[in-house]
């Protein structure tokens, strides 16, 4: 395992934030009918992958990708709830708990 440095964690956090922004812009784009939001979504995805590429210089790829994806899903779910009134059903909540448990297990491995 690589030695932990805060700069790589910061890059990972930035990648997560950009992924959430990309997903919100994608929703606002309404299937790319609102092109500016669609283009902003693409730019945010490119930025997220660029930030992730910096994060994996100091964080194992498997850990960084799992955390990026997992936190991105959980935070996008929260954004969907706050911004769009989207709610999870019982199965969705179970899936979210399993996702979070999996992220913890990967980090502890």
From Swiss-Prot:
The keyword Cell membrane appears for this protein: yes
Disulfide bonds listed in the record: none
Transmembrane feature ranges: 6-26, 36-56, 64-84, 88-108
Assigned keywords, A-Z: Cell inner membrane, Cell membrane, Membrane, Transmembrane, Transmembrane helix, Transport
GO BP terms in the entry: glycine betaine transport
Subcellular location field: Cell inner membrane
Subunit text: Forms a complex with MdtJ.
Family: Belongs to the drug/metabolite transporter (DMT) superfamily. Small multidrug resistance (SMR) (TC 2.A.7.1) family. MdtI subfamily.
NCBIfam families: PRK10650.1
Name of this chain's protein: Spermidine export protein MdtI
Species, as recorded: Enterobacter sp. (strain 638)
